[in-house]
């Protein structure tokens, strides 16, 4: 790695430690030319598939969009932010595990519903009512009945 102080090409690693529950590596480096020390962080770059929307428009996966949709459904519900983050990470892992370069938005919606069903049934119904475009109270009742099975 190039030295950020003198831009020399050669640096050496003095110390490496796992941080963030093993999800990244913190390295202390020293420049072999000017002897300045600096810290770098190394994380795996996990490429998310692109999202194919129902109108065939393709867009990059947007974690913030996923999070805001879930938080909207979970508003004023007794679910911790840690549980929400775990659910988001689970969805992202499932999307990466497909091995596909593109995934339909419908798949993401179904994965969100699956996670919300585990987290909070009311949030699940809220999300499903918008996602599936419930037209009347009968459709709500049918979905609630399916939850009770």
UniProtKB/Swiss-Prot annotation:
The keyword Transcription applies. Residues 49-139 form the ATP-cone domain. It comes from the Bacteria. Its cofactor is Zn(2+). A zinc finger (unnamed) spans 3-34. Binds 1 zinc ion. Keywords: ATP-binding, DNA-binding, Metal-binding, Nucleotide-binding, Repressor, Transcription, Transcription regulation, Zinc, Zinc-finger. GO terms for molecular function: ATP binding; DNA binding; zinc ion binding. It holds the Pfam family ATP-cone. One of its GO terms (biological process) is negative regulation of DNA-templated transcription. PROSITE patterns: ATP_CONE. Disulfide bonds: none annotated. Belongs to the NrdR family. Negatively regulates transcription of bacterial ribonucleotide reductase nrd genes and operons by binding to NrdR-boxes. HAMAP family: NrdR (MF_00440). This is Transcriptional repressor NrdR.
């Amino acid at each position: 790695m190039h030295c950020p102080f003198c831009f020399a090409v050669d640096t050496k690693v003095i110390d490496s430690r796992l941080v963030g529950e093993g999800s990244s590596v913190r390295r202390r480096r020293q420049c072999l030319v000017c002897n300045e020390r600096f810290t770098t962080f190394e994380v795996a770059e996990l490429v998310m598939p692109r999202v194919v929307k129902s109108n065939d428009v393709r867009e990059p996966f947007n974690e913030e969009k996923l999070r805001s949709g879930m938080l909207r459904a979970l508003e004023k519900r007794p679910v911790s932010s840690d549980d929400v983050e775990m659910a988001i990470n689970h969805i992202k892992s499932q999307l990466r595990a497909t091995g596909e370069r593109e995934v339909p938005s419908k798949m993401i919606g179904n994965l969100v519903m699956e996670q919300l069903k585990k987290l909070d049934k009311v949030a699940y119904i809220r999300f499903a009512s918008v996602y599936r475009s419930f037209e009347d109270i009968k459709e709500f009742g049918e979905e609630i009945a399916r939850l009770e099975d």
